Regions:
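Bacterial N-terminal signal peptides that target proteins for export
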Residues: 1-10
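C-terminal motif of bacterial Sec signal peptides marking the signal peptidase cleavage site
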Residues: 18-21
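Short, conserved catalytic or interaction motifs in soluble domains
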Residues: 24
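Beta-strand/loop edge motif enriched in small/polar residues
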Residues: 27-28, 36-47, 52-53, 96-106, ...
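Structural beta-strand segments of beta-rich domains
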Residues: 55-57
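Asparagine-centered strand-capping/turn motif at beta-strand->loop junctions
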Residues: 61-68
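Short, solvent-exposed loop/linker segments at beta-strand-coil boundaries, enriched for Pro/Gly
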Residues: 77-95
């Protein structure tokens, strides 16, 4: 009986509480102009490509009053014709009425847009699209810049996307990668409009794709460029008069234009130079935010380099900047920057020649256990077997090999033939208390064959390495340490500055920067 009595009392208390709660009624007054404050009077949505949706941006509407208010209307000035989309306090639409906001509280308005530039400015390369968000009698400007672009993507037939064949598996089944081969009229990329590529754009056999000065190439996620057997890639950028505008540079990057994505690695796949492709030239090119900047499967077995890099920069690769498998590469005035693993991986041997190049890995997005530069002669093909090819040559002349690790140069041999490399008038970051590392004979820094002129553990004083600015300042300890005969073959630096008189190491002659307070 006692339990029954307590149950009756509890039920009675709950009933009284519910009755009082129902008596408590929230009241809302019509919002006055002075009650409302906005987090911004203008919402700038970052640049988008035509017909591609933007990221989501937010505006906060504050109730500054000590009482509850009801906003009569939140709507777009252009109404149903507007290309902006709204989400107000969790509700989608373009016109909202009687929105309640508690005293000293706020609500969010989320804003997106998709604009087809042809609906507003036919043949224009870009168009500034705007509308107004009307909040009762107050307004907030909505602005976005829309860029026209050329879109290239795989065809879809019967629900299947076009594929580029890569080979067959052990059972004889064909496999490939989502992509398409460029048509003859698509093999020249100009600077008239940016290009947006979905999937892998394939260069057909016996064809050459040409990227002219100022071309802008944007790859979607899991997309890239692939060169088939006997095909070539020619990137023919020019020295830019304006270092910020980079009007002569050919730039390969992702298709997200918002500032947040400017230095985000791994936004797209790779520039893939398959085995049998030949005569690749990259001049005044910037390759940024890929998984692998350039993936090179093999060399073309000729006396000439299969890949020539001149004034080329590879930045923010989530895996490797330049990954050359038995490659034949010649590079001058080039930068191999931040990467999740190696800036340059000379894998399964090959032949490499670098003059006035900067290898600098200041990766800070995750733990990195690999050095900036790796040379080896093998690849595992099973748990017990390696495929081996000799490292015929790897010359680093007037270069910098640096980073935020203590050891930025790795050499490993599995085959019988000794690896052939030399660091001549080259600065190297290599400092470790682990004496076992020096048991590797390739780290004998007294060897005049491997290290004819090694400059060890000097302060390079890069300007802003975390943001890919590898110019050296007046405080650098590698100023004037280059060999003049090496510099004579590359008489100007990456910015076109003469270096023949007193060459600094790396891709840049030093600059005098104003010290920040």
């Amino acid at each position: 009986m006692k339990h029954y009595k307590w149950a009756k009392i509890i039920c009675l208390l709950i009933a009284i509480g519910l009755t009082k709660a129902c008596d408590y009624d929230l009241s809302f007054s019509p919002a006055q102009t002075q009650d409302i404050r906005f987090s911004s009077d203008t919402v700038y949505l970052d640049t988008i490509f035509t017909s591609i949706g933007s990221s989501t941006y937010n505006l906060r509407i504050y109730n500054q009053a000590d009482h509850n208010i009801k906003i009569g209307s939140i709507r777009l000035d252009q109404g149903s014709d507007s290309q902006f989309r709204l989400n107000v306090d969790g509700m989608h639409g373009q016109d909202f009425n009687d929105i309640e906001v508690l005293a000293n509280d706020s609500i969010y308005v989320f804003i997106e847009t998709t604009v087809d530039i042809k609906d507003y400015a036919a043949n224009a390369p870009e168009f500034l699209y705007n509308d107004q968000l009307l909040v009762d009698e107050q307004t907030v400007e909505l602005i976005t810049l829309v860029k026209d672009a050329i879109f290239l993507y795989p065809k879809r037939e019967d629900g299947f996307k076009e594929m580029i064949p890569l080979g067959t598996d052990e059972e004889g089944n064909a496999f490939g990668i989502e992509g398409f081969y460029l048509e003859d009229n698509e093999l020249i990329f100009t600077n008239e409009r940016p290009y947006v590529i979905y999937g892998y754009a394939g260069v057909p056999s016996e064809k050459t794709v040409r990227f002219e000065a100022g071309a802008r190439i944007h790859f979607h996620d899991n997309s890239g460029l692939i060169a088939a057997e006997s095909s070539s890639v020619h990137v023919l950028g020019e020295q830019s008069a304006d270092a910020e505008m980079q009007e002569g540079e050919v730039i390969f990057e992702g298709d997200r234009l918002e500032p947040f994505f400017e230095n985000i690695p791994g936004q797209w796949g790779a520039i893939w130079l398959t085995a049998g492709s030949t005569n690749h030239i990259f001049r005044h090119a910037t390759i940024k935010n890929a998984s692998v900047g350039i993936l090179m499967d093999y060399n073309d077995e000729t006396e000439n380099p299969t890949l020539v890099l001149e004034q080329t920069q590879i930045h923010n690769s989530s895996a490797v900047g330049l990954w050359a498998k038995t490659g034949h590469v010649r590079a001058v005035n080039s930068i191999f920057g931040n990467a999740g693993n190696a800036s340059f991986f000379g894998n399964i041997g090959g032949s490499y020649e670098f003059t006035h190049c900067t290898f600098a890995n200041y990766w800070n997005r995750s733990f990195r256990s690999t050095p900036a530069v790796i040379l080896n002669d093998y690849v595992p093909i099973s748990e017990t077997e390696d495929f081996v090819m000799p490292l015929e040559k790897a010359v680093f002349a007037n270069c910098i090999i640096d980073g935020n690790q203590t050891v930025e140069f790795g050499v490993e041999q599995k085959g019988d033939q000794e690896l052939s490399f030399s660091l001549d008038h080259t600065a190297l970051r290599f400092s470790t208390a682990d004496e076992t590392i020096y048991e590797n004979p390739y780290y004998d820094f007294s060897s005049s064959t491997l290290y004819p002129k090694l400059i060890l553990n000097k302060q390079t004083a890069f300007h802003q390495p975390s943001t890919n600015d590898f110019r050296i300042s007046q405080e650098s300890e590698v100023i004037g340490l280059g060999k003049s005969t090496h510099a004579a073959s590359v008489p100007v630096d990456l910015n076109g500055v003469d270096r023949t008189n007193l060459p600094d190491l790396g891709a840049f002659q030093h600059l005098i920067f104003e010290k920040e307070d």
